Amino acid sequence: MAFKDNTLTFSDNKIWDPIVNMEVMMDWEVPIMEKSAEFICHNKGDILELGFGMGISADYIQAQGVNSHTIIELHPQILERLNTWANGKSNVTIIEGDWSSISGLSTYDGIFLDTFGDENLDKFKDFSLSKVKTGGKITYWNNEEKEYNPYSFDLVSYDKISVNPEENMYTLIKNNYYMPKVEL
């Protein structure tokens, strides 16, 4: 069964997937989402967000006053929450589906990948490099407590962010998150 077919459980502080018996996202990630949004919104231009989750990063992206904010989401329950969240936000475009198979996308000043149960992560480097504008920035969820570059970007640096995660099943992070920063 693919992630998009799983029935999720939502609470104030997390999204839970009972099929795989783990969290999809938790609110302890707020400092990570805030710093990620600040990084990719460097010029308040056009932003592409892959995965909506709890909407934490989307709130911070909107707070930056960006020109446009395109969000691609695959999971129908999260998509429903995304549509409610986006109501009245004229600079938001929602695309339903798998980011790796969407055609006709524009180019963007910033790209943020934070998906769950994604089977196409091996395509992220080529995809993001083809969609980011010259001078653009890319970041992605780093599930390790170290500098980690699974996509083999040539120019990546890291900002260390102190976090205090609740006990969870989905990450190896204990005290520090290393936010990857790809600047082109």
Model-derived features: where do they sit?
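A short acidic, Gly/Pro-enriched loop at the edge of an enzyme's catalytic core
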Residues: 100-111, 115
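Conserved SAM-binding motif I beta-strand of class I
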Residues: 68-73
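Conserved SAM-binding strand-loop segment of SAM-dependent methyltransferases
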Residues: 89-98
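C-terminal substrate-binding/active-site "lid" region of AdoMet-derived donor-dependent transferases
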Residues: 78, 119-184
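Conserved SAM-binding loop of SAM-dependent methyltransferases across substrates and taxa
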Residues: 54-66
